[in-house]
């Protein structure tokens, strides 16, 4: 058996899908968790200066979350039984990753750095804006959900094409800028300037000034994340219903990587907004089934609890 070493920070983050695959397959590995203060020591040793990285037999290094996850899924039997199944697993995983990636963007500064030091404060800031705006649910748009009555063969090809087109457009074109209300415009100045309405915001202090962040960018990242949820979640709910009415797994009778993605990609978004999956009962049921899997449940019991 190969020797596996997974490098990531001491958080769930982008590496959790890989850890869940190891757990589901009951395969041992070395889980190296790098403290944020030590990252500069490791940076030059990692391909692309990024994490996570999977190291195999102390020699081969594989970067990029989904490349690692797909490799492990193929090795461990969680990637479908033939090419169309694998394509289905791919577009479902990539759709969940769209949500997860836009969620992570909300906690990055303008230079692409994750703001670990301010993460708790930022979550409180977003939660306060949720309450003020009445944002509780991500409503389903029925026209975006694929029909469960369509044949599986047609569903596979059509939904794959639709998803590919969406992802291509997303990667090439930035979403159109949305004009803010006068109140929000007054909050989009640099963080060194306090908003003129309401009490002083605890987020607007020296930390934000040092990290060159501002409320306008936070609002834009939140808007992008919300739009991705409204686009992707109804599509995934409908895709799940295509097999066994959505009462088992995305591939039908057996669990694959995309079912694990349904759990880990939405774990933090659901901590921020417990209503996120309220309109999507099949996705909620799937997450329950994944968490009840004996190996996954054992992993959850033993894993290090982290806030992010």
Curated annotation (Swiss-Prot):
InterPro entries: Glutathione-S-Trfase_C-like, Glutathione-S-Trfase_C_sf, Glutathione_S-Trfase, Glutathione_S-Trfase_N, GST_C, GST_superfamily, S-crystallin, Thioredoxin-like_sf. Residues 165-205 are annotated as: Disordered. The keyword Nucleotidyltransferase does not apply. It holds the Pfam family GST_N. One of its GO terms (molecular function) is glutathione transferase activity. Lens. Residues 2-80 form the GST N-terminal domain. Belongs to the GST superfamily. This is S-crystallin SL18.
């Amino acid at each position: 058996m190969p020797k596996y070493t997974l490098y990531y920070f001491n958080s769930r983050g982008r590496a959790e899908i890989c850890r869940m695959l190891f757990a589901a397959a009951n395969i041992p590995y070395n889980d190296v968790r790098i403290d944020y203060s030590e990252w500069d020591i490791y940076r030059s040793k990692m391909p692309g200066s990024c994490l996570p990285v999977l190291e195999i037999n102390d020699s081969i290094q594989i970067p990029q979350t989904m490349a690692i996850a797909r490799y492990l899924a193929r090795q461990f039997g969680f990637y479908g039984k033939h090419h169309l199944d694998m394509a289905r697993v791919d577009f479902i995983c990539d759709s969940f990753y769209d949500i997860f990636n836009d969620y992570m963007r909300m906690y990055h500064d303008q230079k692409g750095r994750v703001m670990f030091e301010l993460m708790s404060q930022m979550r409180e800031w977003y939660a306060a804006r949720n309450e003020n705006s009445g944002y509780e649910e991500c409503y389903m748009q029925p026209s975006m959900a694929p029909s469960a009555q369509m044949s599986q063969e047609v569903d596979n090809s059509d939904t794959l094409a639709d998803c590919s087109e969406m992802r291509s457009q997303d990667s090439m074109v930035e979403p159109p800028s949305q004009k803010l209300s006068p109140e929000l415009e007054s909050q989009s100045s640099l963080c060194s300037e306090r908003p003129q309405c309401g009490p002083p915001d605890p987020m607007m202090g020296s930390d934000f000034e040092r990290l060159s962040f501002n409320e306008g960018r936070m609002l834009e990242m939140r808007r992008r994340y919300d739009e991705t949820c409204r686009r992707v979640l109804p599509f995934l709910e409908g895709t799940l219903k295509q097999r066994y009415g959505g009462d088992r797994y995305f591939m039908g009778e057996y669990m694959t990587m995309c079912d694990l993605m349904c759990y880990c990609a939405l774990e933090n978004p659901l901590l921020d907004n417990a209503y996120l999956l309220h309109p999507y009962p099949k996705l909620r049921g799937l997450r329950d089934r994944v968490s009840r899997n004996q190996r996954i449940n054992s992993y959850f019991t033993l894993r290090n609890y982290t806030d992010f």
